[in-house]
Amino acid sequence: MAFNARSCCFASSNERVTCNCNCLKDQPVPRMKHSKDPFEAAMEEQEESPVETEQTLEGDERAVKKCKTSVVAEAKNKDEVEFTKNITGADPVTRANKMQKILSQFTEEQMSRYESFRRSGFKKSDMEKLVQRITGGPKMDDTMNIVVRGIAKMFVGDLVETARVVMRERKESGPIRPCHIRESYRRLKLQGKVPQRSVQRLFR
């Protein structure tokens, strides 16, 4: 209820009143403002503040996770770079210099054999037939064929080089003979460079 001091008019705050003394003139009675209880205001602030705190904590956690992720990514990239360096070794210039030093110590005969070694290689079809006949398995892919041919080429190179060492020890010259190959094979077998049989022979 609202009380008008100029007239003895009582009216509710939601009603429009007129009186005989024309004190209100069909004007709405102003409403009184309700002040908040201090305790209620404090409770409302406490209810709103946890949300802001949670949002702040979530933002901090996201920032920390992002920072950790970036640090881990940088460390991973660094490890990959170091791993690549260990695989490739030195830079191309250093490798070329080392190779040049090794080649400079070759004799004319060794250089000729090295050039022949670089140009030579096993035929792909022949190696494929040989491996398929030995293993009895299906046709091998191109990658395996390249690996097998590379290993066979290295073994033949070691065999020839050791045979030349045998010839120098025996003070012999000329082409390599079967006796030199047999002695070279025996030495390589003693050095563990010849793979051992996994299955024993049935007949000697």
From Swiss-Prot:
Chain spans, region Disordered: 38-60
Keyword 4Fe-4S: no
Domain of life: Eukaryota
S-S bonds: none
All copies of domain Histone-fold, residue ranges: 106-195
Pfam family, one: TAFII28
GO biological process: RNA polymerase II preinitiation complex assembly
Cell compartments where the protein resides: Nucleus
A molecular function (GO) term: protein heterodimerization activity
GO (cellular component) term, any one: transcription factor TFIID complex
Similarity comment text for this entry: Belongs to the TAF11 family.
Identification of the protein by name: Transcription initiation factor TFIID subunit 11b
